[in-house]
């Protein structure tokens, strides 16, 4: 394998697992829940930009530096140029499509790195933002926005199966069986 090929694979992995795709997924879920139609509108929210930076920071702690581009500079460009650009018509609904198929690469790789790390500060129990993003997806699966109104869910090949496992859990419910969540997250 050539040096160029290796570096391009590292850059692709950084985008897929750290500085771009995990942020897109979080924006898709929370955008739908909070009623944002487009990605650029979400960047005006008081909390979403902080969530995105937090996810990226948690991911980068255990990610390999690609060496070709600087992850912090790449993230800065995404946060200040790409996401707030009203000429990029990306929608929350489009990004939320097929999320069940994306979670493994977008968050699972990072979670495995935390589990396998021998560095004390790299403990899964220290994570805040990645678990919040995953919780946002579980909340999204309920098909109820943050105002308690039914919302249209984006296509996902596992949607029926996932929603069936969440039966009995309702909006605002705080007492639910862990089995439902464990069965979804272990897939």
Report each predicted region and the residues it spans.
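Non-transmembrane, aqueous-exposed alpha-helical and coiled segments at domain scale
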Residues: 1-187
